[in-house]
């Protein structure tokens, strides 16, 4: 589930991100985030916060919208977050665009 190339370090503070699309309910997405938090914590990380955004479809460049990405970036900077985990598969360019925008290592499920 979590990319084996990116190892989560013990006590690493992580933020989780998911998009609620038209075929998902908020409750389903919360269940997915709870599972992702459990996986991260099993790997030794501390899941600090979850961000969600309702979109018809994910943004092709950054998966989430510009405002949400800015909100995540501000939180990451203010709380010294080590890693951001998206609860979906991202393209290589999306991962790069997100990491560049929020100045934090970003991985996907």
Predicted regions and their residues:
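N-terminal accessory targeting/assembly segments
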Residues: 1-109
């Amino acid at each position: 589930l979590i990319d084996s190339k990116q190892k989560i370090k013990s006590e690493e503070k992580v933020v989780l991100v998911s998009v609620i699309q038209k075929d998902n309910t908020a409750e389903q997405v919360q269940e997915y985030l709870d599972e992702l938090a459990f996986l991260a914590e099993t790997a030794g990380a501390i899941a600090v916060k979850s961000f969600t955004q309702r979109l018809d479809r994910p943004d092709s460049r950054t998966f989430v919208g510009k405002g949400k990405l800015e909100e995540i970036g501000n939180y990451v900077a203010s709380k010294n977050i080590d890693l951001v985990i998206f609860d979906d598969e991202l393209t290589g360019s999306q991962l790069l665009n997100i990491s560049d925008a929020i100045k934090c290592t970003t991985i996907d499920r």
